[in-house]
A protein has these predicted regions:
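Cofactor-centric catalytic regions
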Residues: 2-15, 28-165, 176-199, 255-261
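Generic long, charged, amphipathic alpha-helical segments
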Residues: 21-27, 196-220
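Hydrophobic/anchoring residues in structured secondary elements
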Residues: 25, 142-144, 205, 251
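C-terminal structured "cap/appendage" subdomains that terminate the fold
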Residues: 216-235
């Protein structure tokens, strides 16, 4: 999916001071953990990553307290410290418990309140061209600026933004859901359009890193961020070009034709 296993392995490796290739992320077992609620809020890196950071630091502290690991060490020395600990004391384990940020006020029973410990921010700028014969809109260039805390993996993060922007361009210009008799009438790739590589412009991704105290090494989640801003940016660019405000999505050619009279 979004590369969570890679990011979580990186967080553990950085906290332990070892290479990422030495970290295996075990498959999650929902029977062994409490209910964490619905799949929302782009929170895996921030919440699970913080737990992993805390547990990894605790594991390193255990080795240090046992006199098996110094302040500076190599991968070989870390491996040796782990082996020696197991030989002397048994299994080497570290545990971590999630603590919500103090300003969160959430009622699990009523499902009300503010459940978010941090927000990511973004600015999007779209350059568009409108064909005045066909009224087709094309996005020619796109700039996406994100403030997402510390970026753990720049390649994965940029890919997440680029993919989200491409999806949002489809939402803004192409993806028109037609309902008929309570059913989606255009549920085929022949009549439900999504952008292809030809329709996707160059996407310039810029990250501004402002560390968040509630995330691992200052990281925040970014999963849903690029779906929020591109459509308004595209609509604003069309308004700037044609002098008309469009108030519904997708912005189809017939929508512009009607608006221009």
């Amino acid at each position: 999916g979004q590369g969570a296993n890679t990011v979580l392995a990186q967080i553990a490796a950085e906290a332990l001071g070892i290479g990422c290739d030495l970290v295996d992320v075990a498959p999650p077992d929902t029977a062994a953990v409490p209910n964490s609620g619905p799949t929302v809020a782009s929170r895996t890196t921030m919440v699970v990553g913080k737990l992993i950071e805390s547990a990894a630091l605790g594991l390193k502290k255990t080795l240090t307290a046992a006199g098996l690991l110094g302040e500076v060490y190599s991968t070989r020395q870390f491996r040796a410290a782990c082996r020696d600990y197991v030989a002397l004391y048994g299994p080497l384990r570290a545990f971590s418990q999630y603590h919500a940020p103090p300003d969160i006020r959430w009622d699990d029973e009523r499902y009300r309140g503010d459940a978010y410990g941090a927000f990511a921010w973004a600015v999007y700028v779209a350059q568009v061209a409108v064909d005045m014969v066909t009224y087709e809109t094309r996005v020619e260039d796109f700039v996406a600026v994100q403030e997402v805390g510390r970026v753990v993996n720049p390649v994965l993060a940029a890919g997440q933004i680029e993919g989200g922007v491409a999806q949002a361009i489809g939402w803004a210009l192409y993806e028109n859901v037609v309902w008929r008799d309570g059913r989606m009438a255009n549920a085929r790739m022949t009549d439900y359009l999504i952008p292809t590589a030809v329709d996707t412009p160059p996407i310039h991704v810029v990250f501004i890193e402002n560390g968040c105290p509630h995330g691992p090494f200052g990281a925040k989640g970014i999963g849903e961020l690029p779906m929020d801003g591109p459509a308004p940016a595209i609509a604003s660019a069309i308004e700037n070009a044609l002098g008309i405000a469009v108030d519904r999505l997708p912005i189809l050619p017939e929508t512009l034709e009607q608006a221009l009279g």
